[in-house]
């Protein structure tokens, strides 16, 4: 498996492909708007369970480097000050994945950051950490199924 396979899968995912990745937990990941040829500007609908919480949102690709990185900005009607970054690095026989959520305003908007902390709570962070440590090992089987 390579980092390019991971970023290609995430950039061109369909609901069916996403559901096969983690059945019953990954519900939807599909494009809702098409951006540039490099996927910047693409909007996707994501729907999955993070622990017991169902997370549904739209996200816009704001940065894409095939085989290296995808950055989505979360959107609920308007673009929010929250970003999901997936960075991949090819290593001998594997791919190292770094999954980061960044949230918060700059400037005067920082006064509203406590509202984000209500959503991105320590409990949510722990559930997301467990989720990511389960889902990314599963992607190998999704991209390279073993012979039955």
Describe the predicted segments one by one:
Residues 1-36:
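Hydrophobic ligand-binding cavity/cleft-lining segments
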Residues 17-18, 68, 79, 101:
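Acidic, low-complexity intrinsically disordered regions
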Residues 2-5, 127-131, 135:
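Short amphipathic alpha-helical segments
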Residues 29-76, 96, 130, 134-148:
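Glycine-rich portal/gate segments that line the openings of hydrophobic small-molecule binding cavities
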Residues 74-130, 141:
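Beta-strand/loop substructures that line and gate deep hydrophobic ligand-binding cavities in soluble
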Residues 2, 66-67, 91-94:
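Short strand-connecting beta-turns/loops that link adjacent beta-strands
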């Amino acid at each position: 498996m390579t980092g390019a396979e991971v970023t290609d899968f995430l950039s061109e995912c369909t609901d069916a492909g996403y559901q096969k990745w983690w059945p019953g937990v990954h519900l939807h990941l599909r494009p809702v708007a098409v951006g540039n040829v490099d996927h910047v500007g693409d909007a996707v609908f994501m729907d999955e369970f993070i622990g017991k919480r169902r997370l549904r949102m739209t996200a816009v690709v704001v940065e894409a480097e095939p085989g290296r990185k995808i950055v989505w900005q979360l959107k609920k009607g308007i673009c929010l000050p929250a970003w999901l970054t997936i960075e991949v690095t090819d290593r001998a026989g594997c791919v190292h994945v770094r999954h980061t959520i960044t949230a918060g305003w700059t400037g005067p908007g920082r006064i509203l950051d406590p509202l984000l902390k209500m959503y991105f709570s320590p409990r949510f962070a722990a559930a997301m950490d467990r989720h990511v440590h389960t889902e990314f090992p599963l992607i190998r089987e999704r991209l390279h199924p073993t012979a039955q």
